[in-house]
Regions:
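Short acidic/polar N-terminal linker immediately downstream of export determinants
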Residues: 2-78, 99-115, 283-294
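Soluble periplasmic/extracytoplasmic beta-strand elements of cell-envelope proteins
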Residues: 48-50, 57, 93-95, 113-115, ...
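Generic recognition of long tandem-repeat/solenoid scaffolds
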Residues: 68, 90-97
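Core solenoid repeat modules with strong leucine/isoleucine-rich periodicity
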Residues: 81, 88, 94, 297-300
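Short, exposed beta-strand/loop patches in secreted or surface proteins that constitute
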Residues: 82-87, 290-292
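Surface-exposed, polar helix/loop patches in the mature regions of secreted/periplasmic/lumenal proteins
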Residues: 102-136
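Right-handed parallel beta-helix
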Residues: 123-180
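Short, surface-exposed interaction patches in beta-rich subdomains
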Residues: 170-173, 177, 188-313
């Protein structure tokens, strides 16, 4: 195992005056901070980052090598975070741990900003903190227990983004995109994907772009997929309105909601085998929608208690 080389900018002082004199450290109402920066010069093909807490920012770059900035934050000398980094078998591993905390707890976290070559594979896991990634072309796996996930300017073979509590925002391209949050909105703006999964238990789903196969699901929240191109689309909600407007004729659409309305807009250029089922709600199909029970393009919309509207565009 080869350790990556680095330099600490300064060590934290015990008083504000001492912290100001050191430059890289500060003390703010009992909270200490320290910033460390270093470069990793070994050959690296993947990065694995694990953190108990703190914001993580990953930036793709055309520059060679990896640049790491760590901002430590702690409340007393007994729980100062201890960062670690090493390179083995082409993987840079970044991790940290906290010291013993006093009764009543205390602050202990490291915020990371890591600049990497665009094509590296990345795996980021943090218990508590936001994750942002931009300008990346490698395989991405992002996990946070509490915090939003933002991915921009993506050009990746695969993206997996999971958060227990927080919003997910994604733009760019991915062969496969798996987006999941227990509590929070999922927003995919102009996303291009061969296969998309977007699941949230409590939150809305907003989607534009292209997804050849799309699986959208929310327990409590609506689904808004407008200006979308999709060949195979499944949309399910327990309690939330479904609004879908497809810009290209689909092969298959399956939409279901337990207690809300469904509004679907299809291209008028093709015919569809349409099935609408609602126990307690109206059903309306525009005359502009070409229906043909023999069509290979199938549309099935089901609600327990909600209206169904199918229009043509």
């Amino acid at each position: 195992v080869n350790s990556a080389t680095g330099t600490a900018l300064a060590a934290a002082g015990a008083a504000a005056a001492a912290a100001l004199a050191l430059g890289g450290c500060s003390v703010d109402f009992g909270v200490h901070t320290e910033t460390r920066s270093y470069d990793v010069r070994e050959d690296v093909t993947a990065v694995r980052l694990t953190s108990d807490g703190g914001r993580v920012e990953i930036v793709g770059s055309d520059a060679p090598g990896i640049a790491v900035q760590e901002r430590l934050r702690w409340s007393n000398s007994r729980n100062k975070p201890r960062p670690r980094h090493s390179v083995a078998d082409g993987t840079l591993t970044l991790s940290s741990s906290c010291g013993h905390t006093i009764i009543g707890g205390g602050a202990c976290e490291i915020a990371y900003r890591v600049r990497v070559p665009r094509g590296l594979a990345l795996q980021v896991t943090t218990d508590d903190g936001a994750i942002s990634a931009s300008g990346l072309n490698g395989r991405l796996t992002l996990r946070t227990g509490n915090g939003p996930i933002t991915v921009r300017h993506l050009r990746a073979p695969a993206l997996s983004a999971h958060t227990d509590s927080g919003a997910i925002r994604v733009s760019g391209r991915a062969e496969t995109a798996d987006l999941r949050t227990d509590t929070g909105t999922i927003q995919a703006a102009a996303l291009q994907a061969a296969r998309l999964t977007a699941h949230t238990q409590d939150g809305r789903i907003h989607l534009t772009g292209r997804a050849d196969t799309a699986d959208l699901q929310t327990d409590s929240g609506g689904i808004d997929a407008t200006a979308l191109a999709s060949r195979r689309l499944t949309a399910r909600t327990a309690d939330g309105t479904v609004r879908i407007a497809l810009s290209t004729p689909p092969d298959s659409v399956r939409a279901r909601t337990d207690s809300a309305a469904v509004r679907l807009t299809l291209p008028a250029s093709h015919s569809y085998a349409v099935t609408l089922e609602s126990q307690e709600g109206s059903r309306r199909i525009s005359p502009a929608v070409h229906q043909d029970n023999r069509s290979p393009r199938t549309v099935v919309v089901t609600t327990n208690d909600g209206s169904i509207t199918v229009d043509a565009a």
